[in-house]
Regions:
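Short, strongly hydrophobic alpha-helical membrane anchors
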Residues: 1-5
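Low-complexity or membrane-interfacial segments used for flexible interactions
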Residues: 7-88, 94-97, 106, 110-112, ...
Length: 211
């Protein structure tokens, strides 16, 4: 009797896992350094101005992230304070100049993160972004829109004129969190990197809190 009641549950779980995997495949736009642009990106948006990459072990507690170019040169480095209530993160460029700072709001139900980019852009991101039924999220302070699969960080970033700024894709079936950032507007490079680093840290925090 017990096994009989468990079978429908197991079948439903399998269907859900397959469905999530299928959706991830649909949205995935990852390509490795040295490979050509994802064919869907190329058809929809053309050749990106440049591509950047991040990599981190899937279940690592290490928060530092290197952002590399097509030749595996480190162009940005993200470092976080391990013992900080606000999970303060600093992003620096290859010359060790600060390009952005990220800070988590204390006592927030929505895990709000404040991002300050050198040059004047300031905005916030929250875990509301990861609601499973939403495929679109607007960063009000910038007027930018993220559209896609946020749970796996496969999304397109548009500006307030609906022009593509960047396309972010995660590599599936990997022991590392690997992301590709195809940049179509290099003037917004630092802001895009800050968004991706913030979302990576938020996803890592969600995994650790649920484990």
């Amino acid at each position: 009797m017990y096994m009989g009641t468990m079978q429908p549950v197991l079948i439903l779980m399998v269907i859900m896992v397959v469905g999530i995997f299928a959706v991830s495949l649909i949205f995935q736009r990852y390509h490795s350094a040295g490979e050509g642009t994802d064919i869907r990106n190329y058809k929809e948006y053309g050749e990106p101005a440049k591509s950047l990459y991040t990599s981190r072990y899937l279940f690592s507690f290490h928060k530092d992230i290197d952002v590399t170019d097509e030749n595996d040169n480190v162009v940005y480095h993200s470092s976080s304070k391990l013992f900080s209530f606000t999970n303060e993160t600093t992003i620096t460029d290859v010359e060790d100049r600060v390009v952005a700072r990220i800070e988590k709001k204390l006592f927030s139900l929505h895990s709000i993160h404040y991002i300050d980019v050198v040059g004047g852009k300031s905005f916030e991101l929250s875990k509301e972004l990861f609601r499973i039924l939403d495929m679109k999220f607007t960063i009000d302070e910038l007027g930018w829109t993220l559209q896609g699969d946020f749970a796996n960080l496969n999304f397109v970033l548009y500006n307030n004129q609906e022009r593509v700024i960047a396309v972010v894709g995660q590599k599936l079936l990997s022991m590392r969190d690997k992301y590709c950032i195809d940049l179509y507007d290099v003037n917004e490079e630092a802001t895009v990197v800050a968004i991706v680093v913030t979302l990576e840290n938020m996803l890592m925090a969600r995994r650790h809190s649920s484990s």
